[in-house]
């Protein structure tokens, strides 16, 4: 005989859930806007965006608090789809109980012979991909963790074939050599093939971040109109959800002629007539984050990129036995150049997961390193902080991070406190303290500028000091004043960097 709760008991339980949920939402809203403490009112139909002003990171924090309070596991897409606390309530009521992950079988690729792994004479990214296709076309280049699906393996040959179809589609739609094509796509196979396909068509890719939430597509596009106009983008490659609304951009971006999806590009059947790229040709436009002003487009040539990729590889001593595990967005230089294009050049596999997967489940990054025996990974400081503050011990049982030899920490200020907390906590799971590698870079240098010596423990010093790190061998630098004279010592410093990249 089973005991079913009465209707009144069920109603009481739901009301308690509502009360706790609204309390969590209001508490976070107050923390974000303490000056409006008394005026913040939260109902089941309050808009998370308009009324409570929750951005993507605020939503991530809210998910952590809800899961902890109710002991449930919310779906990853929840971050993008929830619009009100009522949506949160439905998700909590439908969510399964949270379960600890189990250790997954390891995935390994056979190492390549040293003479087969690196295209030393390649002069462009086209040369790099074609070289690998000639040497080991079926070797797995990318392990892609797509939402709701099993891991997808993409070989060098598969990437080139897919990219060539995209290139034909772009040519048929009028993309001219040297013209820019903006990519507003989420992490996935489409992004990789459309990026390479644009280059094969003779165009210049312009990576842009996709809208985080569907209800905000129009606002997102409006904010990007200035970048699209500045880039003289004649083509926008995006998702079917964005495509209809993106047509509104044509009045704000005079050069915009084509708005197309990856599926439409792949429908072309003609043979690709290849174009010859030169080292000095533009490979893509990398827009800065805009943290110090309006985002600026940085022109990166094939020569720039290959110089920086080779310099970074030399500093950290990579080879084809390495594995790069990344959740970093592909519109950011650390994710695009450091993770993907670096792995493309050096023939070590890239394990790619979406930023949303990491933000909702930070432990998924660590488990991917465990499963694939990852040796290299990277994150801004906040990613390491999330692993320290938002991952419970129960979610780490059986985790082994002993393979992780290079943990880049950059793209934002590095916190000594975070470095200490992360290394101390995860040394219990095999992470080596000397694997933490604080780095400095900027889009104008393609990516990397300074790196500490490999194998050295992080040095945390609070005295006023000028030497910050060693540059790569191909990146000489000096410290100067505003008047460009050599300076030593000083309080206010400028870095004058001269680089091929």
Put a short name on every predicted segment:
Residues 188-213, 226-235, 322-323, 341-351, ...:
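A short helix-loop-beta submotif of the ANL/AMP-binding
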Residues 1-111, 161, 234:
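Phosphopantetheine-dependent thiolation modules in NRPS/PKS and related acyl-activating systems
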Residues 221, 229, 241-260, 355-501:
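Conserved adenylate-forming
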Residues 142-193, 213-222, 274-277, 297-306:
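Conserved AMP-binding/adenylate-forming core of the ANL superfamily
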């Amino acid at each position: 005989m089973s005991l079913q709760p009465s209707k009144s008991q069920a109603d009481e339980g739901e009301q308690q859930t509502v009360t706790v949920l609204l309390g969590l939402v209001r508490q976070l809203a107050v923390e974000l806007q303490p000056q409006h403490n008394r005026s913040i009112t939260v109902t089941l139909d309050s808009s998370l965006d308009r009324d409570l002003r929750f951005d993507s990171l605020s939503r991530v924090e809210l998910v952590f608090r809800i899961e902890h309070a109710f002991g449930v596991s919310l779906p990853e897409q929840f971050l993008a789809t929830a619009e009100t606390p009522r949506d949160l309530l439905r998700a909590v009521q439908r969510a399964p109980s949270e379960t600890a992950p189990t250790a997954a079988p390891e995935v390994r690729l056979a190492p390549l012979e040293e003479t087969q792994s690196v295209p030393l004479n390649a002069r462009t990214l086209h040369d790099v991909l074609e070289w690998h296709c000639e040497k080991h076309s079926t070797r797995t280049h990318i392990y892609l963790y797509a939402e709701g699906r099993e891991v997808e393996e993409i070989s060098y040959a598969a990437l080139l074939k897919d990219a060539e179809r995209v290139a034909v589609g772009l040519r048929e739609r009028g993309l001219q050599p040297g013209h820019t094509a903006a990519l507003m796509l989420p992490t996935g196979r489409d992004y990789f093939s459309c990026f390479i396909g644009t280059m094969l068509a003779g165009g210049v890719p312009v990576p842009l971040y996709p809208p985080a939430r569907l209800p905000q597509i129009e606002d997102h596009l409006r904010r990007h109109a200035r970048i699209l106009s500045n880039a003289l983008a004649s083509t926008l490659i995006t998702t079917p959800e964005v495509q209809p609304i993106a047509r509104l951009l044509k009045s704000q971006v005079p050069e915009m002629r084509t708005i197309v999806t990856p599926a439409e590009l792949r429908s072309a059947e003609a043979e690709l007539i290849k174009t010859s790229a030169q080292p000095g040709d533009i490979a893509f436009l990398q827009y800065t984050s805009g943290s110090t002003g309006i985002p600026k487009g940085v022109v990166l040539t094939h020569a720039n990129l290959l110089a920086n990729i080779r310099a970074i590889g030399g500093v950290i001593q990579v080879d084809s036995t390495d594995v790069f595990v990344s959740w970093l967005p592909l519109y950011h230089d650390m994710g695009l150049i450091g993770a993907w294009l670096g792995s493309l050049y050096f023939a070590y596999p890239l394990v790619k997961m979406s930023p949303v997967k990491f933000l909702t489940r930070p432990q998924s990054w660590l488990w991917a390193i465990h499963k694939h025996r990852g040796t290299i990974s990277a994150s801004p400081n906040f990613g390491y902080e999330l692993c320290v503050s938002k991952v419970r011990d129960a979610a780490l049982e059986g985790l082994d991070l002993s393979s992780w030899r290079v943990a880049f920490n950059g793209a934002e200020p590095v916190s000594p406190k975070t470095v200490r907390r992360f290394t101390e906590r995860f040394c219990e799971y095999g992470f080596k303290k000397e694997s933490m590698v604080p780095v400095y870079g900027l889009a104008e240098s393609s990516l990397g500028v300074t790196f500490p010596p490999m194998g050295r423990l992080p040095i945390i010093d609070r005295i006023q000091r000028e030497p910050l790190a060693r540059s790569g061998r191909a990146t000489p630098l000096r410290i100067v004043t505003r008047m460009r004279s050599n300076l030593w010592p000083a309080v206010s410093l400028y870095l004058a960097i001269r680089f091929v990249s």
